[in-house]
Amino acid sequence: MSDNRQTPSGELSYYGLSLLSYLHDSHPLLAADTSFIADRADRAAEAYSDAIRAGSTHAEAEAAASDELYRRLHFSPYNTLVHILWDEFAAEVPEEAARAVALRLLALPVFRDVLAKYDLTDDFAATPEYSQLYTELVGTVQILLEDGLQ
């Protein structure tokens, strides 16, 4: 596999920058994982090249690269928690603080344990298990808020 991780000047590639931007918005705990970002960027570039060599159009090759770049990242526990805080705990957590609170919550072992029970596939939000996860997360947030987390 070629080294498409960084440009000669040491900057991230197009795919690396695209993924980094997405991670900042949807998976902030992964945004500092440079190995993960570089590996995914390499795989996306390879998928693009393979598709072009196989006769795919630019649009088809770009779709193949995007599939590889964002695989298993479409569902965001972070964004789910942010929306739970906005929708269920607006009185307890100000809207402008929800993102920071969600980030703190995701770092707690209790949240990692809840999330580990589910197969968080790209289409997880469309599954029946999503409702169960949502309920568990609401309950966990409620308990933590009652115990003084703010």
Q: Positions of the model-derived regions?
A:
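C-terminal alpha-helical interaction appendages
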Residues: 2-150
